[in-house]
């Protein structure tokens, strides 16, 4: 790279890492999608399109604090689709929007990672650090990958997130089967 006037550090920083989580299960899922693409098999992944994904830790006034990590930019691999689904919860319905990321395998084979987002998400509800009203599901469902679930509101939000993803994914599969 150096012989061609390129710097590996600059290349590594050129594109932000999708802040979709890099824990064991997320990494394993990514490897599976890549492997199935490489083998030429059909198999797409489903997840949630978190606006802030993980969070960053910074020092302010000699204190460690957490701040949102806005990984989504206009220069993203994420492709907005026209696909939407209504997700019905008790007492409310929210609209999901599907975004796609191509997962490229060896020899140009590929599959897709379908990420669902809530159309009514509101990034402005994030307060000090990464705090937000966890009970306003219509505005917060896809804000953070790991919302604080140390209280009932956080645990209920996680259940809403899981239900939202499963419902949107199931509707997508049923729609494909009907074609």
Which stretches of residues belong to each language-model region?
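A conserved ligand/cofactor-binding region detector
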Residues: 1-179
């Amino acid at each position: 790279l150096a012989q061609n006037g390129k710097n590996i550090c600059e290349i590594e920083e050129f594109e932000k890492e999708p802040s979709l989580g890099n824990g064991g299960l997320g990494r394993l899922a990514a490897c599976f999608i890549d492997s199935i693409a490489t083998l030429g098999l059909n198999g797409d992944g489903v997840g949630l399109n978190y606006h802030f994904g993980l969070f960053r830790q910074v020092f302010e006034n000699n204190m460690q604090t957490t701040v949102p990590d806005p990984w989504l930019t206009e220069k993203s691999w994420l492709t907005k689709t026209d696909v939407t689904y209504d997700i019905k919860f008790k007492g409310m319905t929210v609209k999901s929007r599907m975004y796609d990321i191509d997962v490229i395998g060896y020899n140009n084979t590929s599959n897709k990672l379908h990420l669902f987002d809530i159309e009514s998400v509101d990034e402005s509800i994030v307060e000090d650090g990464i705090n937000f009203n966890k009970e306003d599901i219509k505005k917060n469902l896809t804000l953070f990958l790991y919302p604080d679930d140390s209280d009932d509101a956080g645990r209920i939000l996680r259940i809403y997130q899981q239900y939202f993803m499963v419902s949107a994914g199931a509707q997508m599969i049923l729609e494909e089967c009907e074609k």
